[in-house]
Amino acid sequence: MEIKRTASAGTMESSDIMITVKPSNNGIKIELKSDVEKQFGNQVKKIIKNTIEGMGVKNVYIRAQDRGALDYAIKARTRTALERASKGAEEIEK
């Protein structure tokens, strides 16, 4: 999957995560800001990275703003943002 544009998914509400995806040429880069980063930061990054790799993405910049989201929400938000970012403008308008 190729990331063609910037896209996001999620909210800044409690127990959710906002994932912003941007094209990159430098592999996978994840920037995380989290209310629970000391406790769960590595786990959140691992879920995001596994989701990215599972979708076949090789180059992407991800900014994640976590407000205590559970694993399933992190994965769903990441998948949605990646899918949105992989579509060109002509595909979105359909």
UniProtKB/Swiss-Prot annotation:
Transmembrane segments: none annotated. InterPro entries: CitD (IPR006495), Mal_deCO2ase/Cit_lyase_ACP (IPR023439). Its main location: cytoplasm. Pfam families: ACP. Keywords: Cytoplasm, Phosphoprotein. One of its GO terms (cellular component) is cytoplasm. The modification O-(phosphoribosyl dephospho-coenzyme A)serine is found at residue 14. It is found in: Cytoplasm. Belongs to the CitD family. Covalent carrier of the coenzyme of citrate lyase. HAMAP family: CitD. Oligomer with a subunit composition of (alpha,beta,gamma)6. This is Citrate lyase acyl carrier protein. The gene is citD.
